[in-house]
Amino acid sequence: MALLQIAEPGQSPKPHERRLAVGIDLGTTNSLVAAVRSGVAEPLPDAQGRLILPSAVRYHAERAEVGESARAAAAEDPFNTVISVKRLMGRGLEDVKQLGEQLPYRFRQGESHMPFIETVQGLKSPVEVSADILRELRQRAETTLGGELVGAVITVPAYFDDAQRQATKDAARLAGLNVLRLLNEPTAAAVAYGLDKGAEGLVAIYDLGGGTFDISILRLTRGVFEVLATGGDTALGGDDFDHAIAGWVIEEAGLSADLDPGSQRQLLQIACAAKERLTDEASVRVAYGDWSGELSRATLDELIEPFVARSLKSCRRAVRDSGVDLEEIRSVVMVGGSTRVPRVRTAVGELFGCEPLTDIDPDQVVAIGAAIQADALAGNKRGEELLLLDVIPLSLGLETMGGLMEKVIPRNTTIPVARAQEFTTYKDGQTAMMIHVLQGERELVKDCRSLARFELRGIPPMVAGAAKIRVTFQVDADGLLGVSARELSSGVEASIQVKPSYGLTDGEIARMLKDSFDYAGDDKAARALREQQVEAQRLLEAVQSALDVDGERLLDEEERLAIAAQMDTLRELAGGSDTAAIENQIKRLSQVTDAFAARRMDATVKAALSGRRLNEIEE
């Protein structure tokens, strides 16, 4: 008799057989793939022994060239060589046009405003370009490990919004990868350091890569990595340092800033090389065309100071959001190649009052942490899976009457999470409701970001306020949002997986947070005004409806005129901006209609009891 093989969900049916899973750091400038081998997480090399894969793709008519050779061709073939594609992930065409000087491509608009890059191989979306990089990493891993991968943990900046995360998952699917988890880059770094050091306490993760900056404040306790707060800038990184140096060269050499794409790429490569050499040297000679000059580390520090200051501002905000003091943070983990710049390390050390941790190569630490988590999720470490408590960077909510933003999940809420809230109809007989999903910190819809819209139909006709619609927001472990709405009496339901066509523009998250603090007082006043205006409109409609049905029957002319006068006054005030006056007039109209409401109730009760015996009523 054959025995049925039974295995735990996610575990191998062969207990001694390891399931091959990898961690991938899909970076703006460089990418890596790592795996746990013989109990140690380590980056996987290519055939030439190189660990780092430049995030560059050069398109030929029949094939795609990925990595070092593609990056080397950027100056001679700029239109067909795509670099820093991470900056384009989840963005719309209007957003990427703002980066035109930094990304000299020929863009075309595709469906849902998605940008496409013109190449000799045809139009390529950022998702397709990222997929080519991921495919190269997958092939490297399968060759090195000698088998097919069961999945990968792919890291993303903590500040990536829903669109950017979804774009990353789509790229992985195109590359033939099963995504076990999208992991925030700072959390991945904490995994690497937490396991290696057995660290506990409050830790800051300062992650400055080629194109993005993240700062996260974490509490590490016995294998639990809790993100207390996160911040950063989706358009700040080492690329900005390169552009600052390039600008200095143009100014010193007296060149025109309007360079052709090939010359621009060549100048940026020279700038990047100078930046890297200044990590170990006090000054370097920079040559471009017929010009050459001396660039000192002190001059570099001056050039990049505005960018360093921007990162420190985000750090202070994240510390404040976490509810802890700077002095309580006992260590700072440095992540990303741009943290090798001496001025960056010095500035971070001065802010936090401690020597930054650089034990693990900052280029490798994220991939190593992702590999450790991938190994656990693949079922190779029973009983040792880490509990990772990430957070959402901006509040999620929906639009209510009057253009108000009702927050359902506040920012810095730990994910995965599900929250529900009940809403009701605004008008009598309303049978449908538009659900408008929003992201942001402001009180008014116009100041927040629209994520998605969907409609709940089939609501039973009822008087305004009688229907109960439960709206549930669910954010999964990857930070992706789903929203459902259900009318409780009938059970009719509608839902949506939020997949916006493009993400937040440069610095928009930081701006949204800043605005929420700067305009907090104004926003509350505006919200209070809108709420009173909505209540005034609701009361006016309810009174008018009652007058149309019972006014002639239950009121004399003097009473009708008195109510009409108060209604006219409320209509006039509701069109203004005096919140207190509207509130007081609502009270006056309510008072003048109290007797009318009581008579309507008496008439309704009398009609209900008419023709029935006393014993029938008592029963």
From Swiss-Prot:
Task: List the Gene3D superfamilies.
Answer: 1.20.1270.10, 3.30.420.40, Actin, Chain A, domain 4, Substrate Binding Domain Of DNAk, Chain A, domain 1
Any single GO molecular-function term of the entry would be: unfolded protein binding
CDD domains, from UniProt?
A: ASKHA_NBD_HSP70_HscA (cd10236)
- Lineage, top-rank taxon, reads Bacteria
Q: Does the keyword Nucleotide-binding apply?
A: yes
Family from the record: Belongs to the heat shock protein 70 family.
Instruction: Please give the function described in this protein's UniProt entry.
Output: Chaperone involved in the maturation of iron-sulfur cluster-containing proteins. Has a low intrinsic ATPase activity which is markedly stimulated by HscB.
The name this protein goes by in its record: Chaperone protein HscA homolog
Q: From which source organism is this entry?
A: Pseudomonas aeruginosa (strain LESB58)
